[in-house]
Amino acid sequence: MKELISSGLEALGLTGSVPPDAAEKLAEYGRLLLEKNQVMNLTAIRDEAGVARLHMLDCAALLPCADFSQARTLLDVGTGAGFPGLPLKILLPQLDVTLLDSLNKRVDWLNEVSAQLGLTGVRAIQGRAEEKALDKSMRDSFDLVTARAVADLRLLSELCLPFVKVGGRFLSMKSVDSDQELDQAAHAIKLLGGRVRDVKDYAIPGADVTHRLVIVCLLYTSPSPRDTR
């Protein structure tokens, strides 16, 4: 798996800009994922090549698509098995990463994996996005918020934009067949203070797959009620 990831990072032009042990850590993460997947439903992908390409390199492909240079904090909403938040942490260790998931057992596993990989500045927490958005310590707090196809873009924007700082960005990983979603989400994004800054389609190295990254900038804090508890 390490060789597939390493060659994929090279194909993406990332070899010199990510830590030298990034491929090794991503491969170890993939190994731990497949091992745990035998007793916990974490991914439908059950082979090393699929995990390398459709999980690790899919997330790594975000780096050429978006500017991460000024970002210091990242929240991954509906992280599941940790995508894309944990690979981004491995590739960009300067990021302070929070992984949000609704299931305690996944959260516990993600914290265990982070420790096994020797990562610091990353935590997994349990909760639902619509509830955590009411928490003063999390609302309007992150430079970047990510989500990987956990819902349609309109709903994702409503769930994710409340966490973004003004001037920050929401990065939504979608399929290339999401044009209708984009159209349907436009009004909600505007009401929430956002604007679609860019839509980038990208190929995953070694896979005959193209995915899409929708980049939404937050221009001002949403006027809709988001009172803290």
Language model features with spans:
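Conserved SAM/SAH cofactor-binding pocket of Class I
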Residues: A60-A151, S157
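Helix-to-beta-strand junctions that scaffold the AdoMet/dcAdoMet cofactor pocket
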Residues: V164-K165
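Short hydrophobic/aromatic beta-strand or adjacent loop that forms the aromatic wall/cage
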Residues: V209-L213
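A structural micro-motif
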Residues: G16, L95, T120-V122, G168, ...
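Class I SAM-dependent transferase core
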Residues: L4-S69, Q116, T120
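C-terminal substrate-binding/active-site "lid" region of AdoMet-derived donor-dependent transferases
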Residues: R169-A203, I215
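Single conserved hydrophobic/aromatic residue that forms the stacking wall/gate
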Residues: Y220-R229
